[in-house]
Amino acid sequence: MSVGVAVLGSGNIGTDLMIKVLRLSDSLRMVAMAGIDSGSDGLARARRLGVTTTADGVAGLVTLPEFADVELVFDATSAGAHRHHDSVLRAYGRIVVDLTPAAIGPYVVPPVNLDEHLAETNVNMVTCGGQATVPIVAAIGRVTPVAYGEIVASIASKSAGPGTRANIDEFTETTARAIEVVGGADRGKAIIVLNPADPPLLMRDTVYCLCPDTDADRSAIIAAVTDMVGAVQEYVPGYRLKQEVQFDRVDSYLPALGGHLTGLQVSVFLEVSGAGHYLPEYAGNLDIMTSAALRTAERLIGRRAVTA
């Protein structure tokens, strides 16, 4: 039996997520979409697909008769708005999957730590860059300690809507923190690049990990990274290694660490293409977020069905 869900936010991410629920999920049933722009393409598309809509945001959502059938809400708005949404939805006892950088609930990256947070009522999906790169940092960390993890996420400017642009600072802060908390690095740093190239380029992510152990098993690191890429591909088919994993010796002062490091730099280069459910293939940054959110919601609901 499927469980009713709603989407807050009628922008790029919210609309792509709605379509994924409708097309791909056997356990989730799309009940309602709430936005604040009555003329948005997302709300118009939802209405055409038979989904109940409101342009009055979370206040409108909770007053819909259909809200009684909603057990889980995806929040695809902004970090600032999510703080209010969480307080409202918490009062109604709804599970919340947060696709903003607000991070009220714990960070969740499905192949790394989802199993640890199946009992939570609010989970945070980090950022698109976090979903693409934190699994790699975690994979390397399973073989050898990571003193410093730095990621650079390059996304097509055309795929970045107003919500993404408004959250740039939160993006870098949340992603860097997730590199540490979920990825296991002692220190983390994140950089986002909005690439204006036309035609738009696919999402590219570069992961640099500095490891104190110069003699770390390189074959084991490659195997761990390859296995993790396969785990992400289970729900994001367009996620792939762009080049072979690269290794370089490091023996220098590193300002990010505030000291000297002798060790190994591991460099991983990734590419993410989207499934094209709502936006074109180049919007892999949206696809990895919505796909991770869908996977997380299905597991959260599945866990509750088992324990009910």
Curated annotation (Swiss-Prot):
GO BP field: catabolic process
The protein's enzyme class: oxidoreductase
Reactions performed catalytically: acetaldehyde + NAD(+) + CoA = acetyl-CoA + NADH + H(+)
List of catalytic residues: C128
Molecular function, one GO term: NAD binding
Annotated binding of NAD(+), by residue: S10, G11, N12, I13, S159, A160, G161, P162, G163, T164, R165, A166, N167, N285
EC number, as in UniProt: 1.2.1.10
Keyword entries, A-Z: Aromatic hydrocarbons catabolism, NAD, Oxidoreductase
Key word Cell inner membrane present: no
Family recorded in the similarity comment: Belongs to the acetaldehyde dehydrogenase family.
Classification via NCBIfam families: ac_ald_DH_ac, PRK08300.1
Entry protein name: Acetaldehyde dehydrogenase 1
Originating organism: Salinispora arenicola (strain CNS-205)
